[in-house]
Amino acid sequence: MAALDLLGRRWTLRVIWELHGNGAPIGFRDLQRRCDGMSSSVLSRRLTELREAGIAASTATAAQPAWHLTALGDDLVTAMGPLLDWSRSWAERR
């Protein structure tokens, strides 16, 4: 249930999606730009929660940390694949 708790928090799935879609580590500001309208404090909180859950990690590159999904995060995206397929089908019927 803790995983659903984390994934149900506002912006969490969007952060995971953007980290996955980027394909390479991404800096905080770039990630914030991709997540339209998210405050820096909320993004910081979500990244911390995802790091503590083992879903995301940061790598120091120069002076800025860059964020990426861990192997566990990649597994999560794979597990969510059927949900994405269902949501596309649902959207087409609306």
PLM regions: where:
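N-terminal helix-turn-helix DNA-binding core of bacterial DNA-binding proteins
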Residues: 1-41, 53, 61-68, 74
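Amphipathic alpha-helical dimerization/coiled-coil segments
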Residues: 17-18, 22, 68-71, 75-94
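Short, hydrophobic-biased segments on the C-terminal half of alpha helices
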Residues: 47-48
